Design a protein with these regions (language model features):
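Single conserved hydrophobic/aromatic residue that forms the stacking wall/gate
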Residues: 1-11
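Extracytoplasmic
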Residues: 8, 112-114, 173-178, 279, ...
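Short, solvent-exposed, polar/charged sequence segments at loop or secondary-structure edges
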Residues: 27-165
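Amphipathic beta-strand/beta-sheet edge segments enriched in Tyr/Trp
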Residues: 116, 122-235
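Beta-strand/loop-dominated core regions that host nucleotide or nucleotide-derived cofactor-binding catalytic loops
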Residues: 191-247, 268-272, 276-285, 300-366
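Short, structured interface segments
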Residues: 246-270
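Short, well-ordered loop/turn sites that connect or cap secondary structure elements
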Residues: 292-294
Length: 366
């Protein structure tokens, strides 16, 4: 089973909308020994260039506005679905004729489209013993697109067996470094106004000249670098692991989740808003996977509209997780049965603030 295939299976985080494009895997160049800072610096520029060269920003716009592959027309269905907006509010043709309507369209863009991110995960194998044995067979683990986990019964596995390396030893020794590079779609008021005024059309108003214009300008939608986080998988419990594929998924999924958690702590704009699902008890569907610990603190936010109909978030209080009530929602946690694995949410207690209501949002603070 190829690492490429397994890699595709372990990147989806339910706390973020799945906005995946068709292109999700790329080959990483083999670099000579570098420091962590040198690797991150070299890769971020190469990745950013690759993303922009492949017009990933334009493809994100196509995805958001559900572009028709035949007519090139757009619609707001996905924006309505993701943002729970009323259909009449997001009628672009009507909105262009009123300042308030345009403000609400821009608000939808600010709420959703401008918070479009691309996460590129560089996974590198680090176990010296296994790497040395496999390199002797001409296999280099750790570079995406060229690495495979040997399956029992395969020619590679049999060869490894002949060298005296047991399959179980391979599984136990599987450790990785994951560096997650975060990029953000450059979507601002000027870009949005140009799109809606000069490029937008729907299937009721086909304009082939605009289709050609958007096709020509897809490369103008850029992604900018936000930052990166590097984590080490360390030792991983074998609970629930039946084969090499399971181990790869468990190690890499947990490492990527940990890297995402580190990015959230470092960059406020990337932090997830989680709704309170109840106030008795006070709880939300986040846990260890998101890096929640006893020392974590969260602000409680209420969504309000200003006089122009734009969304704002006002802090109404601060809460903290209750000891022994933190949900262990890590990948395959049910097999390890550590504290919190049998919970369905994390329970919080109020530090300050007024009354809270279900649906209010919480966001981690430093």
């Amino acid at each position: 089973l190829s690492i490429r295939r397994q890699r595709q299976m372990c990147i989806r985080d339910s706390k973020y909308n799945n906005h995946n494009l068709k292109k999700t895997i790329m080959n990483a160049p083999i670099l000579k020994k570098m420091t962590k800072e040198e690797i991150e610096g070299s890769y971020k520029d190469a990745i950013c260039n690759m993303l922009n060269r492949n017009k990933i920003g334009g493809r994100i716009i196509e995805k958001w506005f559900n572009r028709d592959k035949h007519t090139g027309a757009f619609d707001m269905n996905l924006v309505k679905e993701r943002g729970f907006y009323d259909a009449n509010i997001l009628d672009v043709q009507q909105a262009l004729h009123s300042a308030r309507g345009l403000a609400q369209i821009e608000d939808a863009g600010e709420e959703l489209i401008s918070h479009s991110y691309v996460l590129v995960n560089d996974i590198r194998y680090v176990d010296a013993t296994l790497k040395r044995n496999l390199q002797g067979l001409g296999v280099l683990l750790g570079m995406m697109g060229s690495a495979f986990v040997p399956i029992a019964g395969s020619a590679l596995a049999r060869t490894i067996g002949e060298t005296g390396v047991a399959i179980n030893d391979l599984v136990v020794g599987f450790k990785v470094y994951v560096t997650s590079y975060l990029f953000k779609l450059d979507w601002n008021e000027d870009v949005a106004n140009d799109f809606y005024s000069n490029l937008w059309y729907d299937n009721a108003n086909i304009e082939m000249s605009r289709k050609q214009l958007f096709d020509n300008q897809m490369g103008n939608y850029k992604l900018t670098y936000v930052g990166c986080a590097t984590v080490y998988s360390g030792e991983t419990s074998l609970a629930g692991v039946k084969n090499e594929s399971d181990m790869f998924l468990k190690v890499c999924t947990r490492s990527i989740d940990k890297a995402i958690s580190e990015l959230q702590k470092s960059f406020d704009e990337f932090k997830v808003f989680s709704p309170l699902i109840s106030t008795s008890p006070l709880c939300a569907h986040i846990g260890l996977k998101e890096g929640v610990g006893e020392d974590s603190r969260f602000e409680v936010l209420e969504k309000v509209l200003d006089s122009e109909g734009r969304t704002k978030y006002e802090r109404v209080g601060i809460v903290k997780p209750m000891k022994g009530k933190i949900w262990d929602n890590r990948f395959m946690a049910s097999f390890e049965k550590e504290e919190g694995f049998d919970l369905e949410y994390t329970t919080f207690e109020k530090i300050s603030g007024r009354d809270f209501f279900p649906g209010m949002l919480i966001r981690e603070i430093k």
